[in-house]
């Protein structure tokens, strides 16, 4: 859902209990020439990114499809493969190959102990169609999603693959799942309070943002 930045700024100011959106800041060093409104606006995209990375997956929506081409490590439909991720990739929503019994929403990284197991000579410890594993790695051509693994042979392909992109402000709007919008507002307010040196207020706002992400009614 698209939200207007002006509307989000207003909600952030309400969260901070501020009424004057253009009041200049004082005694804040290099940023004392910025208006309060400028500082509020500068936090929204970063706050959205952090919230997206930490939110439960069911709050993020269905995501955007990806995965136009597969690179197989050996033969098509056998073993592991990889898919180039979009440049604006931020978080995986779901990935499933057509011969897998279930989808995967949590990816590992090369620093995880489980990643080394995917190269083991013992097949029982590697990912398989019944217990699939995906990893996100940085390569010379960009970020890749590696999947482990397939046994279905020729004709195996991607059944479903979606992701959440990095949040960007375009035409004074930002795309957010409606289920995380309030958490983004309070996290933005938290970041503003930190900038203003209001530590106690910042902690309260952070607690509210985190509690919104843990709300089981969403």
Predicted regions, residues:
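Glycine-enriched, solvent-exposed interface loops adjoining structured elements
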Residues: 1-218
């Amino acid at each position: 859902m698209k939200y207007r930045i002006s509307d989000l700024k207003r909600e952030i100011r309400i969260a901070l209990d501020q009424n004057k959106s253009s009041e200049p800041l004082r005694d804040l060093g290099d940023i004392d020439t910025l208006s309060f409104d400028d500082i509020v606006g500068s936090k929204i995209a970063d706050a959205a990114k952090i919230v997206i990375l930490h939110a439960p997956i069911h709050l993020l929506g269905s995501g955007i499809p990806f995965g136009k081409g597969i690179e197989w490590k050996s033969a098509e439909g056998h073993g592991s493969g990889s898919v180039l991720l979009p440049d604006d990739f931020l978080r995986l929503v779901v990935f499933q190959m057509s011969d897998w019994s279930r989808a995967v929403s949590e990816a590992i990284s090369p620093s995880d102990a489980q990643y080394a197991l995917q190269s083991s000579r013992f097949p029982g410890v590697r990912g398989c169609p019944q217990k699939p594993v995906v990893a996100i790695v940085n390569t010379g051509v960009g970020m890749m999603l590696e999947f482990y693994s397939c046994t279905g042979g020729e004709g195996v392909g991607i059944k479903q693959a979606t992701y959440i992109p990095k949040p960007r402000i375009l035409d004074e709007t930002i795309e957010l799942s409606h289920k995380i919008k309030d958490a983004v507002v309070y996290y933005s307010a938290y970041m503003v309070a930190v900038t203003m040196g209001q530590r106690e207020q910042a902690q309260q706002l952070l607690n509210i943002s985190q509690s919104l992400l843990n709300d089981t009614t969403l």
